[in-house]
């Protein structure tokens, strides 16, 4: 135990070590220490002290050696790790290099036509370096691993050669291997060149126009491909075989690796346990060495001496009796005998444990490797063998059926592939048609888009033009309506002037007829006047007809407008127009009533005039001059009215020029132009008549010098007065008409607002129409697309019909095959019936055999139960016997020890004195107070679970080393289950 070394003694000396020892431990090594032995009485004591110092020095040297061994061990572990990493890297390089060589070999086998399989395998063996003899420990370990697994031979052989050879040999071997790899790559390049040449030759032959060369090339290519196919098949077989072997080897190696890992884990645990035991033993040895040194120093310091006889206490010395020393020696011998017995018992137990472990391992191996003969002799194996034979025959039959089914399946596959090819062709053709149709549709769509863009641009232009022409048209309509109203007013005035002219002409004719008997000049004038009135009467007929014509035209235009307005306007506006028309009709009726009243007044005035004429005849002479003045005034008034008419005519011309410059699109403009032309003609006729009347008046004024002329002048003056009255009435009517014009202007403004609303409605309708047109175009496009889809679906339906017909034919063929298969199934069912009968017979036999087997199994289970019971009883009896033997031995030892004590107590002359008795008691008490685990320290800790007392250090070490059980009763304890106690 002392040769194992002690770490703690060198680094951490015990608390009871003296300072002299500490100095010696610190200075041990290079310096030579002087040792003080103290007072020595004899040579024996000197030898003892020198031996003690030598022992101490040797212990220190052992500690140093142990530290050096630990450092060297760590260095060795580092080197081993480094060597393992180097070996692993070399293994990886070698493995990938071998894989590279293997790939090159497979490529050469794949493409090299002249190379055989045997040559290839020989080449593979040539690439492997031969295995050298192991020289080092690492190589020896690798050899052991190679003996375990044969799959790792090439890699480890290469590493073994590298480990056993020198640097020059390593370089030469690596150069050889590199050269071999380079040669293999060069072979691949040459092989590729050959293949390229062959391909070029064949392509040249095939591309040449000569049929014979092409046939030769095809035959050569066919033979080459068939040969290549055979080679590839052979290569695939070899590779499959190799893969199978490698997979088996891999599984074996994996199992070995698992077992090795489990063994390594077990060994690691064993190493940890042994290391812990070694540390424990070293600590114990250190404690004993310290204790021994302390005892020796105490003995030397206090001066204990041994004398041969007597036991008396001298000053500073204690005498020990020789008898006591002999007793101690006897006890020591007894303890040695007990220790020997214990060692023998431990060796027997260890031997038994080894035998049990070997038997256990043998049984495990036997369980893993069951005997084949024993298995074959079992009835279960025989039943399974018979079932296997039956199943094997059935499998052969099923294999035959499977071959037939495969042939059928191959036929159906070929037919299916043909059908698929036909369908694909149809699909390709349909795709082409669809693409062409899509292209056409895209072209048409592009054209339609262009047309749509053109129409949109035109529509925008027309909208812009309409927006620009809208206000102009409104202004023109406003002007036209105002001019129409003005023309109507002028027409009314013209009619009034015509009436006045007619009345004046009628009055003049009456005057001329009355004054015809007086003078010849008056006769001639009366004749002229008699001839003129019919002309004058005839002339107004023309303008009345002319006036009636524009009235009819204007009525027609108003009716057309009313119809349009009635169609466009809403019901509310129609009601308003109706109300306005009713008001206009009421105004017309009022005008008619006024005209009737005026005619009545005229009749009354004519009667009054006739009465006045009688009176005026008497007064004509006196008033002739006054009449001339009045006629001149009337003529002036007529001339002023003529000027006004001419001015209005000029305004009408300007308006006509404006109308002519405006676009002639509406009917209202045409009607206005026609009305204007008629009004111009009427004005020219009126001017001519006015001129004729002036000439006639001048002639009459020259002729009328007599009394008749004076009378006529008076009558004319009266007529002028009457006309002035009428003129006042006309002015009143004109004012009424102006008020009516204001009313009509307001109505016209209302109409304009209505027209604006109608224009907005028209725009909205145009927008709606535009939207409807775009929707219609879209719907037409969708309709076209739907038509095309319909045609495509019709084509698809036709193709599907053809496919259905083809599938119906296939179904018919399959039905025929089904009939054949049903017939074969019928025959098979008959055979199956026969076989089922045979199987039922075999089942009955098997049932009988199974019943017998069950009976035998029950008997065997009963026997096995009895055997297990007997074995358990034997084991229990053996255990009890061993316990009894152990207790018997312990009892014998106790009896012998107690017998010795009794003998010592019985001897009277051996009776010790009081001091010895006290010393024995003190020893007994000290033994009771010392810890039973270490036998060194005092008891100062208690376990609260079982209340056994030990030293605190032992309990703490047990807790730290996870041996958390009581040394006496094996009761488990935790961190809070022990604490210190103090015994006085």
Curated annotation (Swiss-Prot):
Bias (Basic and acidic residues) ranges: 139-150, 527-540, 558-632
CDD domains hit by this protein: RING-HC_RNF20
EC number(s) recorded for this UniProt protein: 2.3.2.27
Keywords carried by this UniProt record: Chromatin regulator, Coiled coil, Metal-binding, Nucleus, Transferase, Ubl conjugation pathway, Zinc, Zinc-finger
Class of the enzyme per the UniProt entry, highest EC level: transferase
PROSITE patterns associated with the record: ZF_RING_1, ZF_RING_2
PANTHER family, per the entry: E3 UBIQUITIN-PROTEIN LIGASE BRE1A (PTHR23163:SF2), RING FINGER PROTEIN-RELATED (PTHR23163)
Self-association and partners: Component of the RNF20/40 complex (also known as BRE1 complex).
Protein name in the entry: E3 ubiquitin-protein ligase BRE1A
Natural source organism: Gallus gallus
Gene: RNF20
């Amino acid at each position: 135990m002392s040769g194992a070394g002690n770490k703690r003694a060198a680094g951490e000396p015990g608390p009871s070590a003296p300072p002299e020892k500490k100095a010696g431990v610190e200075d041990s090594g290079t310096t030579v220490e002087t040792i003080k032995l103290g007072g020595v009485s004899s040579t024996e004591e000197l030898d003892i002290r020198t031996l003690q110092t030598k022992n101490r020095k040797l212990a220190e040297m052992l500690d140093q050696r142990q530290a050096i061994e630990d450092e060297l061990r760590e260095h060795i572990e580092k080197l081993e790790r480094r060597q393992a990493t180097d070996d692993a890297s070399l293994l990886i390089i070698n493995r990938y290099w071998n894989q590279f060589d293997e790939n090159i070999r497979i490529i050469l086998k794949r493409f090299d036509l002249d190379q055989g399989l045997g040559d290839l395998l020989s080449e593979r063996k040539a690439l492997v370096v031969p295995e050298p003899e192991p020289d080092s420990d690492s190589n020896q370990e690798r050899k052991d691993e190679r003996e375990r697994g044969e799959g790792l031979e090439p890699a480890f052989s290469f590493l073994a050669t590298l480990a056993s050879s020198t640097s020059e040999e390593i370089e030469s071997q690596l150069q050889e291997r590199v050269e071999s790899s380079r040669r293999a790559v060069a072979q691949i390049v040459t092989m590729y060149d050959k293949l390229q040449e062959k391909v070029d030759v064949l392509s040249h032959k095939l591309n040449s126009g000569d049929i014979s060369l092409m046939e030769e090339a095809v035959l050569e290519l066919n033979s080459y491909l068939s040969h290549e196919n055979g080679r590839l098949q052979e290569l695939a077989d070899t590779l499959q075989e190799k893969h199978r072997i490698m997979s088996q080897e891999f599984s074996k190696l994996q199992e070995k690796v698992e077992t090795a890992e489990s063994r390594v884990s077990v060994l690691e645990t064993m190493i940890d346990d042994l290391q812990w035991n070694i540390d424990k033993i070293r600590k114990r040895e250190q404690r004993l060495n310290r204790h021994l040194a302390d005892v020796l120093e105490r003995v030397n310091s206090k001066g204990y001496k041994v004398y041969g006889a007597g036991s008396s206490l001298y000053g500073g010395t204690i005498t020990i009796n020789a008898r006591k020393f002999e007793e101690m020696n006897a006890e020591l011998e007894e303890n040695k005998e007990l220790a020997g017995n214990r060692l023998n018992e431990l060796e027997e137990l260890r031997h038994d444990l080894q035998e049990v472990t070997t038997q256990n391992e043998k049984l495990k191996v036997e369980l893993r490797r069951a005997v084949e003969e024993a298995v074959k002799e079992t009835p279960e194996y025989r039943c399974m063998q018979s079932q296997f034979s039956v199943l094997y025959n059935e499998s052969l039959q099923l294999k035959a059926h499977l071959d037939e089914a495969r042939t059928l399946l191959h036929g159906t596959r070929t037919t299916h592939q043909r059908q698929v090819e036909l369908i694909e062709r149809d699909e390709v053709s349909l795709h082409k048609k669809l693409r062409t149709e899509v292209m056409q549709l895209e072209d048409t769509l592009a054209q339609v888009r262009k047309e749509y863009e053109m129409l949109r641009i035109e529509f925008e232009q027309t909208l812009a033009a309409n927006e620009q022409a809208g206000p102009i048209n409104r202004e023109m309509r406003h002007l036209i309506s105002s001019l129409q109203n003005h023309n109507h007013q002028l027409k009314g005035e013209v009619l009034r002037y015509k009436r006045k002219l007619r009345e004046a002409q009628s009055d003049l004719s009456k005057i001329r007829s009355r004054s015809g008997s007086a003078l010849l000049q008056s006769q001639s004038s009366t004749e002229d006047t008699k001839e003129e009135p019919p002309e004058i009467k005839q002339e107004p007929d023309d303008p009345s007809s002319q006036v009636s014509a524009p009235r009819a035209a204007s009525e027609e235009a108003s009716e057309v407008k009313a119809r349009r307005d009635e169609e466009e306007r809403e019901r509310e506006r129609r009601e308003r127009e109706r109300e306005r028309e009713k008001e206009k009709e009421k105004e017309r009726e009022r005008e008619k009533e006024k005209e009737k009243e005026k005619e009545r007044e005229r009749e009354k005035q004519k009667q009054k005039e006739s009465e006045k004429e009688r009176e005026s005849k008497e007064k004509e002479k006196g008033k002739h001059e006054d009449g001339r003045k009045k006629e001149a005034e009337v003529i002036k008034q007529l001339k002023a009215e003529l000027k006004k008419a001419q001015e209005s005519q000029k305004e009408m011309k300007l308006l006509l020029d404006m109308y002519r410059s405006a676009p002639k699109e509406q009917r209202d403009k045409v009607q206005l132009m026609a009305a204007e032309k008629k009004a111009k003609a009427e004005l020219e006729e009126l001017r001519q008549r006015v001129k004729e009347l002036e000439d006639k008046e001048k002639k009459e004024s020259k002729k009328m010098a007599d009394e008749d002329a004076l009378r006529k002048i008076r009558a004319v003056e009266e007529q002028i007065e009457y006309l002035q009255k009428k003129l006042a009435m006309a002015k009143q009517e004109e004012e009424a008409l102006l008020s009516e014009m204001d009313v009509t202007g307001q109505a016209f403004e209302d109409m304009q607002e209505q027209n604006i609303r109608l224009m907005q409605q028209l725009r909205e309708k145009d927008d709606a129409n535009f939207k409807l047109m775009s929707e219609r175009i879209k719907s037409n496009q969708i309709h076209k697309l739907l038509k095309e889809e319909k045609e495509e679906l019709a084509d698809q339906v036709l193709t599907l019909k053809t496919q259905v017909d083809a599938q119906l034919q296939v179904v018919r063929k399959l039905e025929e095959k089904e009939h054949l298969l049903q017939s074969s199934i019928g025959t098979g069912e008959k055979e199956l019936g026969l076989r089922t009968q045979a199987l039922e017979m075999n089942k009955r036999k098997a049932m009988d055999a199974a019943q017998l087997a069950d009976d035998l199994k029950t008997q065997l289970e009963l026997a096995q139960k009895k055997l297990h019971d007997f074995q358990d009883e034997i084991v229990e009896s053996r255990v009890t016997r061993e316990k009894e033997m152990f207790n018997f031995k312990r009892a014998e030892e106790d009896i012998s020890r107690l017998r010795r004590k009794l003998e010592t107590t019985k001897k009277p002359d051996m009776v010790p004195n009081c001091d010895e008795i006290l010393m024995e008691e003190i020893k007994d008490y000290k033994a009771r107070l010392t810890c039973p685990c270490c036998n060194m320290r005092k008891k100062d800790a208690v376990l609260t679970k079982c209340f056994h007392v030990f030293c605190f250090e032992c309990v703490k070490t047990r807790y730290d080393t996870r041996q958390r059980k009581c040394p006496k009763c094996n009761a488990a304890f935790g961190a809070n289950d022990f604490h210190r106690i103090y015994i006085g």
